């Protein structure tokens, strides 16, 4: 990284057990490297700019249930100044299965904690939406999925997918077709496509 991230990390070096800084094939390749060296029972990915919602959150989550395959919660979107913008348009349901993602990613990956027994590697054939596929594969394996009923993460508005909307939407359609079938995916994308067309008309741009 050449954006000053390493300098920030050095300030917190006493709290970081291992730092790797080397070339990679993109975001998801770097995350795969993290998965490969993870030694704990669970993984939780937060990207640069994202934060755990509050101190003691993990302790509270595991007090609710100590043996879930997947924990998920809500997300607070913040701007670059750390000001809260609000929650995501898609909100997590009280109960969650992989089938619920037919209409979109109901839980952001910043607010989902997954047992290492459920996880595989990110599929590097997807450049923008590999997290969607990764979460779906984990949910398919999971038997016990617990909703924390609280905000898990503060998510910095922007990022790779938002700056590449059209390629990201195309990848997500392909991923959903793989998991749900073409016609089911096409049907569920009709309202999404309508909203996108309205957006284009109103803004006269992509």
Question: What is the role of each PLM region?
Answer:
Residues 43:
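Short aromatic/hydrophobic "clamp" motif used to bind/position activated sugar donors
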Residues 8, 21-38:
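Glycine-rich, basic loop-to-helix element that forms the pyrophosphate-binding segment
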Residues 177-206:
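Membrane-proximal basic amphipathic "stem/tether" segments
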Residues 1-7, 47:
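A conserved acidic beta->alpha catalytic loop
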Residues 5, 31, 54-60, 81-82, ...:
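Acidic donor-diphosphate engagement hotspot in glycosyltransferases and nucleotidyltransferases
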Residues 51, 55-85:
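Conserved donor NDP-sugar-binding/catalytic core segment of glycosyltransferases
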Residues 27, 46, 51-57, 77, ...:
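Hydrophobic/aromatic residue at the end of a short beta strand that borders the catalytic acidic motif
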Residues 87-171:
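Conserved nucleotide-sugar donor-binding catalytic segment
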């Amino acid at each position: 990284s050449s954006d000053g991230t390493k300098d920030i990390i050095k300030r917190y070096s006493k709290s970081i057990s291992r730092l790797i800084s080397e070339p990679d094939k993109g975001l998801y390749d770097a995350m795969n490297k993290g998965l490969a060296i993870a030694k704990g029972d669970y993984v939780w990915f937060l990207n640069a700019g994202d934060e755990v919602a509050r101190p003691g959150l993990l302790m509270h989550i595991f007090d609710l249930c100590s043996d879930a395959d997947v924990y998920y919660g809500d997300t607070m979107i913040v701007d670059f100044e750390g000001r809260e913008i609000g929650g995501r348009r898609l909100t997590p349901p009280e109960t969650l299965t992989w089938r619920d993602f037919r209409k979109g990613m109901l839980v952001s990956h910043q607010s989902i904690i997954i047992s290492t027994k459920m996880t595989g590697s990110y599929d590097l054939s997807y450049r923008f939406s590999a997290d969607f596929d990764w979460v779906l594969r984990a949910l398919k394996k999971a038997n016990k999925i617990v909703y924390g009923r609280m905000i898990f993460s503060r998510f910095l508005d922007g990022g790779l997918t938002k700056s590449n909307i059209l390629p990201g939407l195309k990848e997500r359609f392909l991923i959903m077709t793989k998991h749900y079938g073409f016609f089911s995916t096409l049907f569920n994308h009709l309202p999404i496509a309508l909203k996108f067309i309205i957006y284009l008309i109103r803004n006269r741009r992509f």
